[in-house]
Amino acid sequence: MRPPIEFIDLKAQQHRLAGAVQKAALAAIESAQYILGPQVTEFEEKLAAFCGARHVIGTANGTDAIGICLMTLGVRPGDAIICPAFTFAATAEAVAWLGATPIFVDIDEDSFNLDPAQLPIALDTAKRAGLKPRAVIAVDLFGQPADYDAIENFCRNEKLALICDSAQGFGATYKGRRTGQIGDFTTASFFPAKPLGCYGDGGAIVTNSDESAEIIRSLRFHGKGDDKYEHVRIGMNSRLDTIQAAILIEKLAIFEDEIAARQAVANRYDAGLHDVVKTPSVMPDCRSVWAQYTLRVDPRRRSALMAELKSKGIPTAVYYPKPLNEQEAYRRFPVAGNGLPTSTQAASEVLSLPMHPYLDADTQDYIIESVREALLGRQSIAV
């Protein structure tokens, strides 16, 4: 009998790192420096070296990281932040926290990332609504960087800040630049299912600005000044936990190896499925970390395909079934242009297959064979 197939196999990674992680966590516990202990600084320094950036500041989670970046920019009510609608809610949620307005833009059909061609339309939408455009949040969805040459040019010309929401794409590269070297800020999430994940919640902000880094370190610690009981700004409580930092140090040590393993899994999927279904595409000179491996299937048959794969013990997931502009909490916010048709279409078609560095070839062959059998048996499923 075939063992259960994990959508993301965290147990396999834990087994590989068990001794090192347990030793690191125990050392953090025994040090009794549970808040901003030395492991936090060590992790921040090692992650900065990994990115090739000047500063990494750990936070409690990736959502807080976005919020703190916006706070660092002084975002307030009346400001507009341009962001894609086809993403997890955290991207726009942090904007709404501050009373600012997210302006939703459509995505590129192939990459699922923000379509740079929509940015001028979003800018006009913001100005027509009497809002002050302040920043663009680009999301590195499913592990692939956004099209940053075009996005950076737009932000530079319009004097807008650029925040790279790399919760899913941290560790990816865009034309020789690793995430963390792009934009004014890069935010990371270390939620356990992310390519670089901890054993709870965690996040980070990457920046090359000394001035911004100083403000961020203050904001994550209640807006403190030189002393923790001196408060120079309104901040929040969002510090990376010492034990999680200790775990992340060990995970970072094997991260490059896992990125390569994820690419090997993606290559096998591509080879086995490209002729029967629309497989993911990565932009030239870019490298994805493959947080998800996402197909596009006919929306009339997606549920049937998922059910058939489930009957064979193969888990699947839909990221995301509904764009943010169609969700109750975000319907009141503006969209650029006459709706977001590409986002709406993608939401009806996307289907993600199991993806993690420890997906062995035999199991993956079984998944590929099962998908092919389902698709070839129902030609209308394939896009």
Task: Annotate each PLM feature.
Residues M1-Q33, P38:
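N-terminal "arm"/small-domain region of PLP-dependent enzymes with the aminotransferase-like
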Residues I5, D79-A80, L160-A161:
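Hydrophobic "anchor" residues on beta-strands that sit immediately upstream
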Residues K11, V40-E45, A53-R54, A117, ...:
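PLP-dependent aminotransferase class I/II
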Residues A32-A80, A94-A96, F104-D106, K132, ...:
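Phosphate-binding glycine-rich loop
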Residues T87-A92:
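Conserved coil-to-alpha-helix start sites within the AMP-binding
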Residues G99:
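Structured binding elements
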